[in-house]
C-alpha cells in the first residue's frame, strides 16, 4: 500500500537535487564505505532506468592555484573507487577549456578547472514508474490520503489511520 497526502511525487521527490551521485561528497569526509555504496546504487539506477537516468559532466572552475590539483586528485580517487562503474574520466582543464565549458564563468582570476562525471535523473518520472510497477503487482496506491497515526497492539505496529483530504473521511 502506498498512501500519499498530495500528488504522487509532488512532495519531497519534487524537491530533490535530480542528481544520482556516487557519493563524491562522502569522499571528502573520508567515508570510503559510503562512497562505494553510493557508486553501487548509482550504477544500479543507471542500469535499471536508462530512460530516466544518464551520465552528466560537472565542471568546477578554479580561482586559486591549489584548487585544480586538490580537487582533481580527489576526483581521480573517486574515479579509481568507481572502477568499471565510472561514467567518464576526471579531466584537468586549462583556463581556456574551462571557459569553453562554462562560458558564463567569471574569467578574472580563473586558473583552470576540473571536469568529472556523475549522474542525473528525472525523480518524478522515476517515482511514478515505481508506483505503477507496484500497482501492476497488486499494491494499492491512494493519493490525497495522508497518514494521521499508527495503530499498535501488544507493542507491535498493526495498522495505521489516514484521512482523505478530498472528502474529509478518516480510515
Mark where each language-model region is.
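Short, conserved phosphate-binding/catalytic loop or strand-edge motifs used
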Residues: 16-20, 156-159
